[in-house]
Design a protein with these regions (language model features):
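Short, charged, low-complexity loops and linkers
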Residues: 1-16, 81-84, 90
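Serine/threonine-rich low-complexity intrinsically disordered regions
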Residues: 2, 72, 87-89, 115-116, ...
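Short, contiguous alpha-helical
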Residues: 11, 15-19, 23-29, 34-78, ...
Length: 179
């Protein structure tokens, strides 16, 4: 594998992870009302809406601007100060747009971009470090959104996936007939 092939593989894997996490966020959002998206379990805690704004800001700053070279105009405090209700459809539109921008950067990333040190949010990092900071950060907050959705919905929560075969881990009484 050449260095360019490795750079392309890193970009493709990161883009796939963003798509997977975005699908989970969309799955959760589809089960919630605008009010639930902006609900805070305590005054000092974030809502799902705040987390989505935060994901937009972080991904834009670290990947789109930091790795891709776009201008960085992030206002991090505003991500957490917002009380909404920005409609959930608008939040998803914003998030999808930033994910697409990031995937565009990741699709064209080269070895120079991966190894070059740049300053992002006060940190001196390589491009690969920026990607491996931002993408797991995105997934972590995605899992937080899943958890917050499940807490609000309880037994009404619909899972995005459930095992159907023994290989996938389905209990014997829950296996689907494959015939």
């Amino acid at each position: 594998m050449t260095a360019d092939e490795l750079a392309a593989a890193v970009g493709a894997a990161a883009a796939h992870e963003l798509d997977s996490a975005l699908d989970r966020i969309k799955h959760c959002q589809g089960q919630l009302t605008d009010e639930q998206v902006w609900r805070r379990s305590a005054p000092g805690l974030n809502s799902i809406g705040n987390l989505i704004l935060h994901l937009c800001g972080n991904l834009r700053q670290w990947v789109v601007a930091g790795v891709g070279g776009a201008p960085d105009a992030r206002n991090r405090p505003a991500e957490f100060a917002e009380r909404g209700p920005i409609p959930k459809e608008e939040l998803l539109r914003r998030l999808e747009a930033v994910v697409e921008q990031a995937k565009g950067v990741l699709a064209g990333v080269d070895t120079r971009q991966l190894t070059e040190v740049r300053r992002i949010q006060g940190f001196d990092v390589t491009g690969v470090a920026a990607i491996f900071d931002s993408v797991p950060h995105f997934r972590g907050h995605t899992q937080e959104i899943v958890h917050m959705t499940r807490l609000q919905l309880g037994d009404a929560y619909h899972f995005a996936w459930a095992p159907a075969t023994p290989e996938q881990g389905a209990p014997a009484d829950k296996q689907r007939d494959e015939g």
